[in-house]
Structure formats: C-alpha cells, structure tokens
Amino acid sequence: MEVSVIGNPQARICRAELAYRELGFRFGSDVISGESRNRVSFCNQSSKWKEIAIRCSSRSVKCEAIVSDDASPFLKSTPKSKSLESVKLFVGLPLDTVSDCNNVNHLKAITAGLKALKLLGVEGIELPIFWGVVEKEAAGKYEWSGYLAVAEIVKKVGLKLHASLSFHGSKQTEIGLPDWVAKIGDAEPGIYFTDRYGQQYKDCLSFAVDDVPVLDGKTPMEVYRGFCESFKSAFADYMGNTITGITLGLGPDGELKYPSHQHNAKLSGAGEFQCYDKHMLSALKGYAESTGNPLWGLGGPHDAPAYDQQPNSSSFFSDGGSWESQYGDFFLSWYSSLLTSHADRVLSVASSAFSGIGVPLCGKLPLLHQWHKLRSHPSELTAGFYSSNGQDRYEAIAEIFAKNSCRMIIPGMDLSDEHQSPESLSSPESLLGHIKTSCKKQGVVVSGQNSSTPVPGGFERIVENLKDENVGIDLFTYQRMGALFFSPEHFHAFTVFVRNLSQFELSSDDQASEAEVEAETASIGSGTGAPSLQTA
C-alpha cells in the first residue's frame, strides 16, 4: 500500500504490495466525485492548487508526504498570532456516524475524509455518541461496538477524538431515546417536557425528573452515571491518548436549554415555556406555596406568545410587561433555577464518574441571539436564561462549570450582527461576548463551535473570535462532516481557514524530489493510480 499526499510534514512512509482500492465520499445519497471513475475531487478543474494524490488499501491508513515547490501557496501561511498558536482544530463527524443498530455508516467515506483532514493539519474529530444507540434495548445493557470501531479508525489515522455523550434524541437522524425509556414514556408521558398545548418533546427527559426514580426504579442521574462509567470502562485503552475530551449532553440538542423552539417552530418567534408536564407543574406548585403565592403555581404565563409569534404580539415580553412584574420575576427565577440545577447535577455526576482519567470535561450552551436587543431577551427567557436582581444567569452557570472543573462550549462563533435580519433584533456578537466575559470571570476555559449552517463571512468571523486576547479559546470544533462539507466550494473555504490557523512550513528533511512528485501525478493522470483528492 502506498499513500502519496501533499501536506502534512508529520506524514511518514509506508509501502506494501497491496491492491489499490477506490475511495469515494458518500454521505447518505450524495456522492462527491471528480471527472473520472477513480477520482474524488474537492475543487473544480481550474484550481491552482497542487492536487493531493492518495493511494490506499483497506489494510493501512499510513501515508507518505510528497511536496513540490508548486505546493507552497497551500503549505505556507503568514505568521499567526500567539492567540491562535494554542487553538486545536477539531471537525465533527456526522450525527449518524453510528446507526441506531450500532453499525458504522459510510465507513469508506469517513475513513478517507479523516485521512484528508489529518493531512490538512486538523488535530482531531468530535464523535456524537447517543444514549439511544448504546443502551437501546434495556437498562444497563450497553453496546459500544460501533463507536469503538470509529475510535479505532481515528486512532490509526493519527487523529485525536473528542467524545460527545448525548442523552437526547435527534429527529434529524431518527435516533431517539432508548427503546426501554420510550416504553416508559408511553405509559408515563410526564417524564417528557410539555408545552401549554399538551404537546410533548420526546427527545429529552424533563429536568424535573432528574432525581425522581421514573426509569425502572432509578433516577435519570443514576442512569446517566451508569452510562458514563460504562463508557469509561469500554474506552479505557483510548483515554488520555486518543480521547482527549468528553462533552456531556445537558439538554435538547446536547445544549443546556429548554426545548423552547420545538415542533419545527420558526426561530424568528419567541419560543414557548416548557413547564406543563406533571413533574414541572408539581415543582411549580410547591415553589408557589412556599413563597405564599399559591395561585401563581397553577401554570406558566397566560399572556406569553406562541412558538412562532413575535414577542410584541402579546404583553408578556413588552417593556413594562408581565416579565418585569413580581409574578414574572417569581416564575422566571423558578424556571431558570431548574435549568441551572440540572446543569449542576449532570456535571457533578460526570465529574465524579470520570475522576482521575485526566481528560477534560465539557458542556455546551446555546447562543440564543434572536431578539437579544430587546430588554426582555424573550428567546433566552423561554429557553431558561433569566437574569435579575443583580444576578447574571450566564455567570451563575459559568460558576457551576467552574465548580465542576468543566469547560464551556459556545457555538455560533461564525455569526455576525451584520448578516442578521434587522427585524429579528438579533445580536450574536453581543451575546457571545457576554458569555465569554462570564466565563473569564469564573475562570472557565472556553471552546468554540460554528453554527450548523454555513453563513457569509463565517470563517473570517471564526478567526476573529479565536484571536480574542481577552478570552483564550483552546479548542474549536467545526461542524460537521458530510456531503456539503466536502463540496468543492466549501472544502476550498475550509482549507483556506485551516491555513490561516496553521503554519505549513516544511523542513528540507520532509521535502521530496520533483521527480517523485511527477511520478505520482503521472500515475494518477494515466488512470492506473489511485483516486486523487484535490484541494484548494
């Protein structure tokens, strides 16, 4: 086997007389390919960049670096600032990398993609691990085979792995909560978040049942602890060497929030309060009685807008509206306190379960920037982020992260105010700055992510955020691999982005002769070689 590439100076030589295998990038029904049947192209034919030639077999993932002077525009970059030198770049694997049947999806494409990312200088890969896949059939019955297979591939390629433990479901991938949990939910729907219309959110358990034995006699926290301990045992050989970080799912989509924008509601709306399952209502009733206001414990605000309605469509979020009243402070303080307590419980469980392994723990917050310019911050309130009486909710949450020695992941670092619609009164830059400042005050290390959909000027905005000297960001995860990621236009932009974060200066020891380069490109062009990857 022989792999010839232009790029990573750390690549080393491995040759063997093995049959070549065609590689393609297929994600779902999409195929990214070049002109000929044995070529995979990441850019159009007018590209000025030197192509990356890859020959490989199923029995090896090692590679050989071949460099020519013509490749210098790709390999060399201007000196980067000190703030970028310590940033590690990761890329997220597809959410459905492992199916709900524990099979690894699009294995060949992912393996080839990992090699390409390694050659670009990417540090590692983020792997979403779903509770509903691993503990699918019965409580305490764990099946890690699919995820272990991915970890082994990542290790062989020479990348690092960041594991995201997801205690939520995903409609996008049709991966739900474990089957045995869903059966309990069918009999006892009160375990799910519920809105005022009685609609349930079945991709995450209600925060109000955290310490209630609703799962075959166990509490969700006890079940999560068992999951974490099983993960630690199953992946013991990878801890600290291949696995260099673990993220704990804190709510819907893995983020610390209420599912306030569920049921395909438009993000332009204010969202809905999720406090109508029986356990939330019971907690609200008890809190109201303890404060001497029993009538306030009958339900959520009656004058709040619906999911996709603008905040000014009713009086609750208006200036001088109910949110500023004594009742509003009572309800919002209670609602947000449950969110904060949930974060503390999950992170405490994880901190205890993973004690002593030397791998950093992380949790993720949402960037709820819609309507942030309004005094009431409606999208943040319905999701559980309420600040009042001198207490900043983000700072309170950062304090909990610090208490549990946990790092905070903040998404949306590719977003700018400039590209938001004026009608939404959105300000991702302001909110992001506020959260980062809260983390700095509490000594919490920040990691970054981009939003799920590419936006204009996104890569440039990410670089600006990573250069922020006030809040050091140690790791950035770009979301997410797939057909769009490897499309010519996007992969070109991603390559330039990586170049801006890394220096690709090679020593003379790493360089190969022009004859070797010509031999490689000639074999590709003749059609007798292996598939090629072109990058721009």
UniProtKB/Swiss-Prot annotation:
InterPro entries assigned: Glyco_hydro_14, Glycoside_hydrolase_SF
Ranges for region Disordered: 511-536
Gene3D superfamilies (alphabetical): Glycosidases
A Pfam family the protein falls into: Glyco_hydro_14
UniProt induction comment: Circadian-regulated, with a peak in expression just before the light period in short day conditions.
Modified sites of kind Phosphoserine: 47
Signal peptide from the UniProt entry: none
Record has Heme as a keyword: no
Keyword Cell membrane: no
One GO MF term attached to the UniProt entry: beta-amylase activity
GO biological processes: polysaccharide catabolic process
One CC-aspect GO term: cytoplasm
Compartments, record wording: Cytoplasm
Tissue specificity field: Mostly expressed in young floral buds, flowers and roots, and, to a later extent, in stems and leaves.
Keywords from the UniProt entry: Carbohydrate metabolism, Cytoplasm, Phosphoprotein, Polysaccharide degradation
Domain of life where this protein originates: Eukaryota
Family per record: Belongs to the glycosyl hydrolase 14 family.
Protein name, entry field: Inactive beta-amylase 9
Natural source organism: Arabidopsis thaliana (Mouse-ear cress)
Gene from which the chain derives: BAM9
